[in-house]
Amino acid sequence: MIVTTPKKIPPMEEIGDEIYKIILPQPFYAPNNIYLFVDNDGLTLIDSGYIESVPMLQASLKTRGFSLRDIKNIIYTHNHLDHISSSLVLKSYAPKAVYYGYRAMQDGVGNYLDSMRLFEQATEDLFTVAFGDPEQLNKIISESRSGWENFYSKFDKTKKGDPILRIDKAIDHNDSLEIGDRLFRFIYTPGHNLYHITPVIQESGAYFSGDLIIANLTAIYSEMDGSLGDYHFTLSKLLEEPIKRLLPAHGHEIEDPMRTITLVKKTLSILEKGVIRRLKESPSDLLNLMEAAIGKKVHNGGHLPTALGLIYSIIKKLVLEGLIEIEKRDNGYEVFHLKG
């Protein structure tokens, strides 16, 4: 990958408590918030963005007199490609950087490209469950494959990339580590993702929540690497924390953390009741249940797998509770019936 200056440079702006933020656009989802700290010997980052965003990250750092080589520490909230895939090439441009992540993540992921191919297949399996119309299914799978090929091609074009995910310092739940000039505490916060952690600066009460909560909403990938049960547990755990600032990886800072976390828990309950109510009226499939609960707008902007995964996680919970049964068709398509 040739690292060049983009046409529009995202600013590296200070947002209080000696925290900086860079908003990196990406081709398939909402822009990523990269949080930074200026230390005596360089920079500490929380997440580093999509592989294609490296030039924008470099250009933004340059506006404050820094370069990629000034990056000394990178803390990863989790291993989704819009947060961590840039690390596959940053190892060459920031050779002294130390990478931090959840202990199980490195061994669990291994070859990052191979792990993303499994993720791609899981996405297609979810589409197969949801779309009963073969023509519509083929169209959505073709679009999905095109997006994934674009990602793989970005790595193939670089001569400095390494597909093996590297974690130098493994993190466990409730670890406290001095990184750069600050003391961080880490909370293991699964639900959105199996390896998700939340870095905390206890001195300021700043919690960097990754993808746990995005603009009062949630993202659970269900069949891929998320868990509705874990997510409920994580939200309850966060409600016990002395959170003063909740800084997500997408969107604006959460203004009222406790109220928002409580609202997300209530929203999940409302969605569950909505699924039951609609199945009382008639059997339905995943696509129609998702559109009734969230709306058709999610078909645009890369949100479709997230929305389907969220509703499917609710359906599986209700199946385990004996409230719903699944009618499986030969092609993988599923229709859901309310028991009784």
Predicted regions and their residues:
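A structural signal for the main folded, soluble domain(s) of proteins
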Residues: 8-14, 18, 34-39, 50-55, ...
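Short, charged, surface-exposed secondary-structure boundary motifs
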Residues: 31, 108-113, 217-221
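Metallo-beta-lactamase
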Residues: 43, 50-52, 149, 158-162, ...
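Active-site HxH/HxHxD metal-binding segment of metal-dependent hydrolases
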Residues: 53, 62-169, 173-177
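Aromatic/hydrophobic pocket-lining residues that form the small-molecule binding cavity
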Residues: 84, 231, 235, 311
